Curated annotation (Swiss-Prot):
SUPFAM superfamilies: GAF domain-like, Winged helix' DNA-binding domain. Belongs to the HrcA family. HAMAP family: HrcA. InterPro entries: GAF-like_dom_sf, HrcA, HrcA_C, WH-like_DNA-bd_sf, WH_DNA-bd_sf, WHTH_HrcA_DNA-bd, WHTH_transcript_rep_HrcA_IDD. Negative regulator of class I heat shock genes (grpE-dnaK-dnaJ and groELS operons). Prevents heat-shock induction of these operons. Keywords: Repressor, Stress response, Transcription, Transcription regulation. It comes from Leuconostoc citreum (strain KM20). Pfam families: HrcA, HrcA_DNA-bdg. This is Heat-inducible transcription repressor HrcA. GO terms for biological process: negative regulation of DNA-templated transcription. It comes from the Bacteria. Gene3D superfamilies: 3.30.450.40, Heat-inducible transcription repressor hrca homolog, domain 3, Winged helix-like DNA-binding domain superfamily/Winged helix DNA-binding domain. One of its GO terms (molecular function) is DNA binding.
Length: 342
């Protein structure tokens, strides 16, 4: 249990470190805080915070910086409720005033402007419709073990993708699989079929039709995912270059940029339930590549379209209060704008 003075000092350390990215010392805190205490008293309080693992010492400085536990304590107990400033409100309003021919254009622009306002990498997961069903599936043989997989869904959309099969697998041997899909999966929601593939249910059923269904399952799964528009819109992808303390070397940066190119990987970490805002720090994200980052997510729902997500990926020392307010404001504005398109 922290004392009021310790809470004040922890909040001040987090604020100054967020602004400067430099370790915070007792003298700086004494100048910043509106309390009459000696530098020695502040050092004692900082020692108590360090013992509680809420702040830590850097090897390169005598000052202290917040630990991940310190940020979590701040988010859960200390972060004050603020209102969106008039300037921020105007920025949000301006970003939605344009004319957008397609929803994808709206989402691209929203991600771009949100990243500019926050300095973070903005991610928007397009809502996935839950009512789209499988209407038909076929394979069109080409040359050299290549084929085109064609999926038709109940919204009239035709999704196709070219694949190359392993040499040991004859295209003609997949006829029974195609028949099985059309007999058993037609009329089922696409998302339900995807869930069946992720469990053992569909692979087990297909193994009764063909001994090694792995290659076909991957082919079919890829087309299914594309058909429901597993779309991720990203703004400020290269903002990660500004998070100096979050990237250790070029290899880390390369892996991170590759991760940000993967719609599937991004959806896995950014997916959230409900419209409330969630902040995950470091290991809470459950993705090793993002252990030095924080992720703010907010869900939104578009009637008859499905659930989407807005997210901000940034350094652990990001300005949480402002970013949470902005992501909430964007969530409300984006929801209203998308409803106009339905």
């Amino acid at each position: 249990m922290l004392t009021d003075r310790q809470k004040l000092i922890l909040s001040a350390i987090i604020y100054e470190y967020t602004q400067t990215a430099r370790a915070v010392g007792s003298k700086s805190l004494q100048e910043q805080l509106n309390i009459k205490v000696s530098s020695a008293t502040i050092r004692n309080e900082m020692a108590a915070l360090e013992s509680a693992s809420l702040i830590k010492k850097l090897h390169t400085s005598a000052g202290r910086v917040p630990s991940r536990a310190g940020y979590r304590y701040y988010l859960d107990h200390l972060m004050a409720n603020h209102s969106v400033t008039e300037h921020d409100v105007n920025m949000v309003i301006q970003s939605f005033r344009g004319n957008f021919h397609e929803i994808d254009d709206l989402l691209d622009e929203s991600a771009r402007t949100l990243s500019e306002f926050t300095g973070a990498t903005a991610i928007i997961l397009k809502p996935q419709r839950h009512d789209i069903k499988v209407s038909g599936f076929r394979l069109v043989p080409l040359e050299n073990q290549q084929l085109i997989a064609v999926l038709v869904t109940s919204d009239g959309k035709v999704t196709s993708q070219t694949f190359k099969l392993p040499r040991e697998l004859a295209i003609s041997s997949l006829d029974s699989m195609v028949k099985y899909i059309n007999d058993q999966m037609t009329g089922r929601p696409v998302l339900e079929v995807l869930q069946m593939m992720q469990s053992d249910e569909l692979p087990t059923q297909m193994s009764r039709v063909i001994k090694t269904p792995g290659a076909f399952l991957q082919l079919f799964g890829d087309v299914l995912s594309r058909s429901v528009g597993d779309q991720v819109h990203i703004g400020g992808r290269l903002n990660v270059l500004n998070f100096d303390e979050s990237l250790n070397n070029k290899a880390d940066l390369k892996r991170l940029l590759e991760f940000l190119e993967s719609a599937k990987d991004i959806r896995n970490v950014a997916q959230t339930l409900g419209s409330h805002t969630v902040v995950k720090i470091s290991q809470e994200i459950h993705e090793p590549l993002l252990k030095s980052f924080s992720l703010i997510t907010r869900g939104f729902t578009i009637p008859n379209q499905g659930d989407g997500v807005i997210a901000l990926l940034g350094p652990i020392r990001m300005p949480y209060a402002r970013n949470i307010l902005l992501i909430d404001a964007y969530g409300e504005a984006l929801t209203q704008k998308m409803i106009e398109y339905t």
